[in-house]
């Protein structure tokens, strides 16, 4: 296995393709970037200089791709040397561009395969073909602004500057979606129509009945909170629905093409399931709100609700209509198409195969797959030189960013074959971890390591190699994948699914103290349902009957509160699964594990995962409080007539308390400075480094211990054409693996599009225009 690394971090300076303002100087570009097909292609697409300002979230870049467009738009690209000649089937772009009726194109796949560049380049090409185009990012860790070299955040379509192309960009604002939910749910009504007066009515009524002690048990329930807690993932579902709302409005009717840059696979699968979940959840809340209209003021007072629920119901029903619109849109073959994006590796192809199965199961239209980053036969030493030059800017960002500067820096080489299996991981780990291993190994007897970062930067390879390194050192080690789109089994070439630790075997016969575990979200979800099991509300209804409140009990039973508790929201499964890992590590049979390495999902997913214990702590806390208070109220009523005999303990309360305790353990583990370390994995590109800067800031804000950053896939100075020859052979094996995935639902049934590995980062409209002309033929 040959290596391609060599630049010491931050050692190379100067020689950029941009001036101090971030604008590209064509004369300097042609001199400094001579020999780069991408740079030459950009120059061919450039006209006069423009005054477009650099994207405010990024420093001036060395990439030719950040060059602004001329004011009058790009001239047709001249013939330039191509990095590869894809053997794409003809008519791909013609089909995507045909007709003026609106089409939605969603590009999804494994993290780091270039979805943003592919989406943005397709949007640029569609706009150049005359379509009024909107490119939308639904990834919680946005990269679209970085790719377009213009800020398109804020939750509203932004017209791209410096070009006359009819092209808009939009990064979805999840906070806006949450605000809309709170408005619709009636949060904050307590102090308005009927709030305090309704609550006082409840107290007066109970006191008149001589049952003031019951209201003491009930008044802390805050039942209204059950209506006002948005589930995890609602933000994305509502946000996509909001895009549909945008394009239905008269002012946005002009969009004939909408391209979605989606989050990595696991997140996208969740996104596709969200409309069903949100639709069902909203239906329950709407039904509850409607029934509250006919309830007595006493019952309404328990929810802090005013006399009329009409306005809240109207808002929630509008929200529900939009969510249903998205649900239908995903499955409409005449309007929507999913394109799977992957790279020529076994891990990438296997994940794409699983994604296609999921899309088929959900009846999502998908007929194309694009294999990106293919090393072409014309790429040689000149390509490697350009790649080394282009990575300088990113390495300098890592060295100089205030959030990343204090971290230990690990430079991991780009290798010429895919790192799979224990021997390859052992070799890779010896190269990567040798300089920091002793420091990381110091301290606590048992340590946790979480590796995270942008999709496709090599988190699974890095985490697996670290686990093998610990095991080679004699430390009993468990490596855990929390990514819904698992790659851990592929990395070890061994099935690690099932939700329990599996002993990892080496083909060399070595007896390593190493186990692997892919968290099983479905199993975790089933366990959560068991914890929340309420027999359709039967247990709750029995409790309400026990209160002996007559019509009030009847009305509360009619509200079917149990239904609000029986649907675990998306995202909860992972948090429960992680809590389960933390829990079973406390058990005596797992006490021998000294090192636990987490291979986490891509950035946006990981940030949500780290905040989920807080969400669950709050939501599970409400459920525990609800059960406890109702049980206590029932006991109080029973004691009144039974002479003070203690009431039976609610089994569900015990289960919920245990779950809450494990959540607390997980939350504490994430933040323990002595036992836990988060390691950011990135690659030497400006876009990936910019995302790493944002991730570091978010982790530090959450109080997560962060000490190390790995810059992976660094091309070394001693890399030669032999390195690329080996890469091409390895990629050919992966492409053959794709072609062998036959059958009606296999990858071989899809139209194959091939896209080149570029020697410079694809950023800015000119580079996207050139890249799009190469790919979308």
Curated annotation (Swiss-Prot):
The EC number on file is 3.6.-.-
Whether Nucleotide-binding counts among this entry's keywords is yes
Q: Which GO terms describe its cellular component?
A: cytosol
Keywords on record: ATP-binding, Cytoplasm, Hydrolase, Nucleotide-binding, Transport
- The residues that the entry says bind ATP are 110-117, 372, 454-461, 712
Q: Spell out the Gene3D superfamilies in the cross-references.
A: P-loop containing nucleotide triphosphate hydrolases (3.40.50.300)
| Pfam families tied to this protein | ArsA_ATPase
Subcellular localization: Cytoplasm, Cytosol
Transport among keywords: yes
Alphabetized GO MF terms: ATP binding; ATP hydrolysis activity
Family membership? Belongs to the arsA ATPase family.
Question: Subunit info?
Answer: Monomer. Interacts with TOC34.
Q: What is this protein called?
A: ATPase ARSA1
Q: Which organism is it from?
A: Chlamydomonas reinhardtii (Chlamydomonas smithii)
Q: Gene that codes for this?
A: ARSA1
């Amino acid at each position: 296995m040959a290596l391609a690394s060599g630049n010491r971090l931050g050692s190379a300076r100067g020689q950029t393709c941009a001036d101090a303002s971030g604008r590209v100087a064509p004369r300097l570009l042609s001199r400094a970037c001579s020999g780069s097909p991408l740079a030459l292609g950009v120059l061919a697409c450039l006209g006069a200089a423009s005054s477009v300002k650099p994207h405010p979230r990024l420093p001036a870049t060395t990439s030719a791709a950040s060059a602004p467009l001329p004011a009058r738009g790009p001239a047709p690209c001249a013939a330039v040397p191509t990095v590869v000649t894809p053997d794409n089937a003809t008519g791909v772009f013609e089909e995507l561009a045909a007709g003026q009726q609106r089409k939605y194109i969603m590009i999804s796949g494994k993290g780091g395969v270039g979805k943003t560049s592919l989406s943005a380049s397709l949007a640029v090409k569609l706009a150049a073909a005359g379509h009024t185009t909107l490119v939308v990012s639904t990834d919680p860790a946005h990269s679209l602004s970085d790719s377009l070299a213009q800020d398109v955040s804020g939750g509203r379509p932004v017209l791209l500057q410096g070009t006359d192309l009819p092209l808009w960009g939009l990064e979805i604002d999840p906070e806006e979606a949450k605000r809309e939910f709170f408005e619709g749910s009636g949060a904050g009504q307590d102090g308005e129509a009927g709030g305090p007066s309704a609550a006082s009515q409840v107290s007066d009524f109970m006191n008149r009945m001589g049952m003031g002690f019951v209201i003491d048990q009930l008044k802390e329930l805050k039942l209204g909170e059950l209506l006002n807690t948005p589930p995890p993932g609602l933000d994305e579902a509502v946000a996509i629905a909001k895009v549909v709302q945008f394009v239905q409005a008269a002012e946005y009717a002009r969009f004939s093409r909408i391209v979605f840059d989606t989050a990595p696979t696991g997140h996208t699968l969740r996104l596709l399931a969200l409309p069903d979940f949100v639709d069902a959840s909203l239906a329950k809340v709407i039904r509850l709100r409607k029934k509250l209209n006919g309830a007595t003021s006493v019952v309404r007072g328990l929810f802090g609700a005013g006399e009329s629920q009409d306005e809240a119901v109207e808002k929630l029903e509008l929200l529900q209509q939009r969510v249903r619109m998205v649900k239908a849109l995903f499955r409409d073959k005449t309007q929507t198409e999913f394109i799977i994006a992957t790279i020529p590796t076994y891990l990438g192809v296997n994940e794409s195969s699983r994604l296609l199965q999921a899309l088929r199961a959900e009846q999502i239209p998908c007929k194309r797959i694009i294999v990106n980053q293919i090393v072409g036969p014309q790429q040689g030493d000149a390509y490697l030189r350009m790649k080394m030059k282009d990575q300088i800017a990113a390495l300098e960002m890592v060295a100089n960013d205030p959030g990343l500067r204090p971290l230990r820096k690990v430079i991991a080489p780009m290798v010429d074959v895919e790192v799979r299996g224990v021997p390859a991981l052992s070799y890779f780990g010896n190269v990567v971890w040798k300089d920091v291993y002793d420091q990381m190994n110091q301290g606590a007897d048992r340590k946790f390591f979480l590796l995270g970062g942008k999709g496709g930067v090599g988190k699974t390879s890095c985490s697996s190699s670290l686990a093998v390194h610990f095991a080679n050192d004699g430390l009993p080690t468990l490596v855990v994948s929390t990514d819904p789109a698992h790659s851990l089994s592929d990395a070890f070439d061994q099935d690690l699914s099932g939700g329990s630790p599996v002993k990892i075997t080496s083909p060399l016969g070595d007896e390593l103290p190493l186990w692997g575990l892919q968290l099983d979200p479905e199993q975790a979800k089933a366990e959560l349902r068991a914890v929340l099991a309420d027999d359709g509300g039967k247990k709750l209804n029995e409790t309400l009957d026990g209160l002996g409140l007559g019509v009030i009990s009847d009305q509360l039973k009619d509200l079917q509160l149990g239904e609000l508790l029986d649907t675990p929201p998306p995202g909860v499964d992972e948090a429960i699964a992680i809590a389960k890992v933390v829990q079973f590590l406390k058990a005596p049979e797992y006490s021998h594990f000294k090192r636990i390495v987490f291979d986490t999902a891509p950035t946006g997913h990981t940030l949500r995962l780290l905040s989920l214990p807080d969400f669950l702590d709050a939501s599970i806390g409400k459920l525990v409080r609800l059960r406890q208070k109702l049980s206590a109220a029932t006991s109080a009523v029973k004691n009144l007539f039974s002479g003070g005999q203690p009431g039976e303990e609610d089994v569900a309360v015990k289960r919920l308390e245990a779950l809450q305790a494990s959540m607390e353990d997980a939350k504490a583990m994430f933040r323990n400075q002595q036992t836990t370390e988060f390691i950011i994995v990135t690659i030497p590109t400006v876009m990936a480094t910019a995302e790493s800067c944002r991730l570091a800031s978010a982790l530090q804000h959450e109080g997560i211990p962060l000490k190390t950053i790995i810059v992976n896939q660094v091309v070394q100075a001693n890399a030669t054409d032999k390195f690329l020859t080996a890469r091409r052979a390895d990629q050919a094996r992966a492409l053959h693996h794709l072609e062998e995935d036959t059958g009606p639902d296999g990858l071989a049934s899809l139209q194959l599009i091939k896209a080149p590995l570029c020697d410079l980062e694809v950023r800015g409209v000119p580079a996207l225009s050139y890249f799009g002309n190469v790919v979308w033929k």
